[in-house]
Amino acid sequence: MPHIDIKCFPRELDEQQKAALAADITDVIIRHLNSKDSSISIALQQIQPESWQAIWDTEIAPQMETLIKKPGYSM
């Protein structure tokens, strides 16, 4: 731990871009949470736009109070 779960609309990321994203996020987590590299895991799930409402309903809206970065949109 920690585990970071990124959900986004589909992106054309090759393996090198995914690795760079993971490295950047890992560096931030190490710096701010004093975690070890070996304890960090990161998931990247690409969600179709027509399925985003379900993410909003189950993961974003119910946790609005605990989000450290709130979205600038509502559904």
From Swiss-Prot:
GO terms for molecular function: intramolecular oxidoreductase activity, interconverting keto- and enol-groups. It is an enzyme of class 5 (isomerase). It comes from the Bacteria. InterPro entries: 4-OT-like_dom (IPR004370), Tautomerase/MIF_sf (IPR014347), Tautomerase_PptA (IPR017284). It is found in: Cytoplasm. GO terms for cellular component: cytoplasm. Keywords: Cytoplasm, Isomerase. Its EC number is 5.3.2.-. The active site is at P2 (proton acceptor). Homodimer. Belongs to the 4-oxalocrotonate tautomerase family. PptA subfamily. This is Tautomerase PptA. It comes from Escherichia coli (strain SMS-3-5 / SECEC). The gene is pptA.
